[in-house]
From Swiss-Prot:
This is Dual O-methyltransferase/FAD-dependent monooxygenase elcB. Its EC number is 2.1.1.-, 1.-.-.-. It comes from Phaeosphaeria nodorum (strain SN15 / ATCC MYA-4574 / FGSC 10173) (Glume blotch fungus). The gene is elcB. FAD binds at E520, R604, D836, A849. In the C-terminal section; belongs to the paxM FAD-dependent monooxygenase family. In the N-terminal section; belongs to the class I-like SAM-binding methyltransferase superfamily. Cation-independent O-methyltransferase family. COMT subfamily.
Length: 931
């Protein structure tokens, strides 16, 4: 009966996914007809998720219907050649035997019989035939891996349990006395084949560098931090990290021959990239570590090659090098899952890797508990573990066992970002990953999925759950396990978006010990250019003072740029100064008051201080559901990859394209102002200081180009305006990580002035680059080129600002705005909006960030007050009773009422600036922006 039920479930899943795939292919016409060049990828990238789901279900189906007596037959060699009569003659083998072999391989998809007389390549065989690295990979498996596997039983019988390097199945298979690496060094042909094999392994999805880049918070390290890449071979991993994180420096360590080869490779253009930040050092990791001022000691695919005794020696030398405060060890290696906790296909790959390590090295892949026991023997402890989705390796962050924990709470956290299943599941969509309940109380270790703690101990009075049903889009039925009757405020506040407002709210909650988690769709904090300034007025500074701890607020103040208030206007053609005024009324009761100038990248990093372990990147929300049981209401957020998170409240701080706004207030549409802007920054190099007007480097500078254009006949006068400001930092604070002094600038005008070459699909807001827009080098280069084209007739002194710009920081955006009068929607006790998600505004008023920060502080007060009112009775927490939920809904309604007032003032102030800078029409005349 159980097998029948399993078969039925898998078949239904296959049918459902097949319909989804066929529907997509029918509209997109992506799937190849089967004709044409062999080896062509038949699935588009957009179907990668469904393809993997279908492949996994198919593997499960095969396993369910395979008779045990047939299993070994399926494991017979999937190898062969590519033809029939002619091939038999060329290979000097009997045709009948050849045909039997090839038809067996065709039955397994390795080749394809196009007619009863002809055999051709399949995509798999074509890949081996045309890709030298893949060919060497296949040869390696055939010549070395398979023979070693064949003799595994012989080695076990001969030596039993052993960790000696030359007592392996490999030694029996090759009939050699030396260990694997010794034999490899002596055999040039094998060495070359092994190198190709490793290149092929490294190029696979499961071992891609992208998992290394996203699996650890490299962006949270202080700029200038030193990463020691222990056993880093040719430095390819360090260069990948250097490209993604320009503020970090790397030291690649390996044996002398390897380092010399790596240095020789630096003659290539590709290897010269980041040469100033990636240096090489000869070092044997079995000897004491010579670098003792490193911030991170990184070992990728190193420890799994060695048995425990040897691994302890390696780790002990690194432990002794942890001299710098906060220094850590990061290991990227396989963390074997418990059976059945990952997809069948991924588990198969990991089990094969485990056996290979035993057969060749007498080493092993380790489970989490084995890793924990290993590092504890060295006086280390696991601080954090991350398992990136799609990766065969996880990342273990280690610190000294007797050191103060680097993460809040002091507990190791095991985080899985793949299709993991756990014993305590609250919401599971067809096996997709589930973000489980937020654990409360203190336990020695808490395990989590996607960063939300879960443990059976988090359930008071035992597990008394019962199940309910929730409706999820596109017909998928999700099982929801409702929780036992315990305080709702042990669940976290879910903050969607790691922009300014979302992080400020997170800091407020952190300050008041209210559980929260932040989810950000960007894959990292440095995914897009954000290196330009924000102007914060007194009200915003007050909001920060209310939200941040004293230490973090002091760091904010120390990071502020030196502000000078005034305005200078230049003529774009002659380069002459038209007018200039210090103060300009900005310091009085009108205009900008008591402003702070901050670099947005630095500011955002400060707002992540102390909470980076609660921020999860690469999580894009698609919808939410408000659920109820007999005790309380709670919200379940569903992400693009199928993962879910459960919380006490959901805050949409996810920018102008907010999925939360579209669901909560679908009638609330943003407006297209008709303008486009290019943001940029130009570092104050000696050349810029020599060419750019000195009077333009004192305070805010405005250049208005009102040259008549043919468009003026059609659309009225259409000025192009440059707004720039010098950003200088005080170097009195040696601990502050600040960028070089630079000039912030923005070019803004009616869209008709900008060419189609510009990427204008994103939206700009009142406080900088819109976080909804993905960044890439090509779009940055196009933006920089557009700035030069628009200012081609300008005076050379002014144009030097664009000629010397940091091209990587240029970005072009469409300017959108919410209407000044926001709609009134029914408030509830589970969901609300913040910042650009609800009241995007033109940057011309310079107040978007101010309004967003005040939003965050005011919402934080709501959570703090409700937490305080329920402190005496933890069981009857916020929302725990109907009366509590009603009270929370009333407080949210009051918050949203004040938010509408703030939004009206900010949007109207921005309108005044927009009208002056690019001639914005009235809001009634604007079209709805398609976002």
């Amino acid at each position: 009966m159980a097998a029948s039920t399993g078969l039925s479930t898998v078949l239904k899943e296959i049918v459902q996914v097949c319909r989804e795939v066929e529907s997509h292919l029918a509209t997109e016409s992506h799937l190849d007809s089967g004709e044409g060049a062999p080896g062509k990828n038949t699935f588009p990238i957009g179907l990668e998720g469904p393809r993997k789901q279908l492949a996994n279900a198919a593997a499960q189906l095969s396993q369910l219907v395979t008779d045990p007596r047939e299993y070994l037959e399926q494991l017979s060699a999937n190898h062969g050649s590519i033809a029939y009569t002619d091939l038999a003659n060329r290979a000097s083998v009997p045709e009948s035997q050849l045909k039997s072999v090839l038809r067996m391989t065709a039955a397994h998809g390795f080749l394809a019989e196009v007619t009863p007389l002809e055999i051709s390549h399949s995509p798999t065989s074509a890949l081996i035939a045309t890709n030298p690295s893949f060919y060497d990979w296949a040869r390696w498996l055939t010549n070395y891996s398979v023979p070693s596997a064949y003799h595994f039983a012989d080695a076990t019988q001969k030596w039993g349990r052993t960790e000696v390097k030359n007592e392996t199945a490999f030694n029996i298979a090759m009939n050699v006395e030396v260990p694997f690496f010794g034999y490899l060094k002596e055999n040039a042909k094998m060495n070359s084949m092994f190198s190709s094999y490793m290149r092929n392994v490294a190029s696979s999805e499961a071992t891609s560098f992208k998992h290394m880049i996203s699996g650890f918070d490299w962006g949270g390290l202080t700029p200038g931090s030193k990463v020691i890449d222990v056993g880093g071979s040719g430095g390819h991993g360090s260069r990948a990290l250097a490209s993604a994180f320009p503020g970090l420096n790397f030291v690649v360590q390996d044996l002398p021959d390897t380092i010399e080869n790596a240095k020789a490779a630096l003659n290539t253009d590709e290897s010269k990239l980041h040469a100033d930040r990636v240096r090489f050092m000869s070092h044997d990791f079995f000897t004491p570590q010579p670098v003792v001022d490193g911030d991170i000691y990184f070992l990728r695919m190193i420890i799994h090659d060695w048995p425990d005794e040897t691994a302890i020696t390696i780790l002990a030398h690194l432990r002794d090098a942890l001299k710098k405060p906060g220094a850590r060890i990061v290991i990227m290696d396989t963390i074997l899952p418990q059976p059945g906790t990952v997809s069948l296909l991924q588990e198969r790959q990991l089990r094969v890797r485990d056996l290979t390590m035993m057969q060749v090295f007498n080493a092993k892949e380790r489970e989490y508990d084995t890793w924990k026991a290993l590092v504890e023997k060295v006086g280390l402890r696991i601080i954090h573990v991350e398992q990136p989705e799609g990766s065969n390796m996880g990342l273990l962050e280690l610190g000294l066992a007797d050191a103060t924990d680097l993460k809040a709470g002091g507990n190791a956290r095991l985080v899985f970002n793949g299709n993991m299943k756990t014993p305590s599941v609250n919401l599971n969509i067809n096996g997709a990953s589930t973000i489980n309940e937020f654990a409360h109380g203190s336990t020695p270790e808490t395990f989590a999925v996607n960063g939300i703690h879960t443990t059976d101990k988090a359930r008071p009075n035992g597990d008394t759950t019962h199940s309910g049903q929730a409706s999820i889009p596109n017909g998928v039925s999700a099982r929801i396990s409702t929780r036992p009757m315990y305080a709702r405020d042990v669940l976290p506040v879910l903050i969607i978006g790691a922009g300014i407002s979302g992080l400020c709210l997170a800091q407020y909650l952190h300050k008041h010990a209210i559980p929260f988690v932040v989810f950000e769709r960007d894959p990292s904090s440095e995914h897009r250019p954000q290196g330009y300034r924000l102007k914060l007025e007194a009200d915003a500074a007050a909001a920060l003072r209310e939200s941040l701890t004293a230490e973090v607020y002091s760091a904010f103040e120390a990071s502020c740029a030196e502000s000078a208030i005034g305005e200078t206007d230049f003529d774009p053609i002659s380069g002459a100064c038209i007018k200039s005024r210090a103060g300009g009324g900005l310091a009085g009761a009108q205009g900008l008051r008591a402003s702070y100038t901050v670099d947005r990248t630095v500011f955002r990093r400060i707002l992540m201080t102390g909470i980076s372990d609660k921020i999860y990147f690469g999580r894009e929300i698609t919808r939410y559901d408000i659920c109820e049981d007999n005790v309380q209401s709670y919200v379940v957020a569903t992400f693009k990859d199928g993962a879910t998170a459960e919380g006490r409240f959901l805050v949409g701080a996810d920018g102008t394209r907010s999925a939360i706004r579209k669901q909560l207030v679908p009638e609330h549409k943003f407006l297209d102002t008709g303008a486009t802007c290019i943001y940029g920054k130009t570092v104050m190099t000696p050349e810029l200081l020599a060419r750019y007007p000195a009077r333009a480097l004192r305070w805010m500078t405005v250049v208005a180009d009102r040259a008549p254009l043919i468009q003026s006949i059609l659309i009225g006068e259409s000025p192009l305006t440059l707004l720039s400001e010098p950003i200088r930092f005080s170097r009195d604070e040696p601990t502050a990580s600040l960028p070089e002094d630079y000039v912030y600038w923005v070019l803004i005008g009616r869209r008709e002035l900008f060419t189609d070459a510009t990427n204008t699909s994103a939206s700009s807001t009142g406080h900088g680059v819109n976080s909804d827009k993905a960044y890439n080098t090509e779009s940055a280069q196009a933006s920089a080129a557009q700035s030069l084209a628009l200012t081609e007739e300008w005076h050379p002194s002014l144009r030097s600002l664009f000629e010397l710009q940091d091209v990587s920081q240029a970005s072009t955006m469409r300017v959108v705005s919410a209407p000044p009068k926001l709609p009134v929607w029914p408030s509830n006790s589970c969901v609300t909006l913040l910042g650009d998600a609800v009241h995007a505004m033109s940057p011309c008023g310079g107040v978007g960030a101010n309004v967003a920060l005040r939003d965050a502080a005011e919402l934080g007060k709501v959570f703090a007050s409700t937490a305080a009112s329920n402190e005496e009775d933890a069981i009857q927490s916020v929302g725990g009773k109907a009366s509590d939920q009603h009270d929370m809904a009333q407080q949210i309604a009051s918050f949203e009422g004040e938010l509408r007032k703030r939004a009206f003032g900010g949007i109207m102030r921005s309108f005044v600036g927009s009208k002056a800078m690019f001639g914005q029409r009235t809001f009634e005349e604007l079209d709805v922006a398609e976002l």
